[in-house]
């Protein structure tokens, strides 16, 4: 399963807007959560159209970890995928 995370316009230090590509035939993402660096808590991302987004009242602290569950029941965690100093338009691919 290949997953990529592209940082989209609208992202800023307190908000992350992502185009997440999940390539598994016949399956789609059901839930995506983010854990900030140094945090124990997973925060849910909200799906808006084809994009996923998370907002915070304080600046987000990377590198960011992601956890997902697909509609087909696949679960996975990706550590330190996107750095704090992310660039809009950049696609980040987790290491296998």
UniProtKB/Swiss-Prot annotation:
<dbReference type="InterPro" id="IPR005453">
    <property type="entry name" value="Allergen_Lolp2"/>
</dbReference>
<comment type="similarity">
    <text>Belongs to the expansin family. Expansin B subfamily.</text>
</comment>
<dbReference type="Pfam" id="PF01357">
    <property type="entry name" value="Expansin_C"/>
</dbReference>
<dbReference type="GO" id="GO:0009828">
    <property type="term" value="P:plant-type cell wall loosening"/>
</dbReference>
<protein>
    <recommendedName>
        <fullName>Pollen allergen Dac g 3</fullName>
    </recommendedName>
</protein>
<dbReference type="GO" id="GO:0005576">
    <property type="term" value="C:extracellular region"/>
</dbReference>
<keyword id="KW-0964">Secreted</keyword>
<feature type="domain" description="Expansin-like CBD">
    <location>
        <begin position="14"/>
        <end position="94"/>
    </location>
</feature>
<dbReference type="InterPro" id="IPR007117">
    <property type="entry name" value="Expansin_CBD"/>
</dbReference>
<dbReference type="InterPro" id="IPR036749">
    <property type="entry name" value="Expansin_CBD_sf"/>
</dbReference>
<keyword id="KW-0020">Allergen</keyword>
